[in-house]
Amino acid sequence: MIISLSQLSVGYTLSHPVISDINLELRSGQLACLIGENGIGKSTLLKTLTGFLPKLKGSLLLGNRDIESFSQRELARQVSIVLTQKPDVQNLTIEEIIGLGRSPYTGFFGRLRAEDRKVVDDAIATMGIEKLRGRMIQTLSDGERQKVMIAKALAQETPIILLDEPTAFLDFPSKAETFQSLQRMAHERDKLILLSTHDLELAVRFADSLLEVKKGTLQAVSATDVKASIRAIIDR
């Protein structure tokens, strides 16, 4: 799967786009990291790429199709997303939450078949949350909840996975483990995983490509550039 962006502008009003003139191509089989200051538009871009927000201008293609040509169900089979907001659900077990990731493939009543349950089991194992399987979502810590929502995205089995600061609530060892798992998944399962992050050192270590939002633009940057930025911050 390929995401192709041409002359793309994203935001809330055409007169004041958050990011404009985006020209970029991202291919499956890679972990791409989106970096930049708080409030600069990373979440807005991710929401546009998944169809939550309409594009303001330009072209946004998934494969060879414009994103606006997909039905909601079709799009849910192409792109999954994990946002930073807490899920507005309670009284569901972790296994049930992750099972909701199968909804694009289940029938009207949403019953999971044997093959769906295998996918759910695989997502739970991949994120290392077997011990949480029977817990209720409202009993989890922020970090545990984030792992569950990533597992739900994995269970959705989309070629494109978008993650908005997926390691924000994790301790450092868990952050590194999550980055490593996502990189391995992108490579071994031929997925395009795009995540926003402030963990620059981990982004440099694990990302196949680095994208920086700065002053209303999106540009590919090198690991050397990011390391220089880290040094500049430390030396202030």
Model regions and ranges:
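A short, flexible loop at the N-terminus of ABC-type nucleotide-binding domains that lies
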Residues: 1-5, 9-21, 89
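The feature captures the beta-strand-to-loop junction immediately N-terminal to the Walker
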Residues: 35-37
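Helix-to-loop junction immediately C-terminal to a conserved catalytic motif
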Residues: 50
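Conserved ABC transporter NBD signature motif
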Residues: 58-66, 75
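Conserved ABC ATPase signature
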Residues: 136-140
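Catalytic Walker B motif of ABC-type/P-loop ATPase nucleotide-binding domains
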Residues: 161-164
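H-loop/switch region of ABC-family ATPase nucleotide-binding domains
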Residues: 197-198
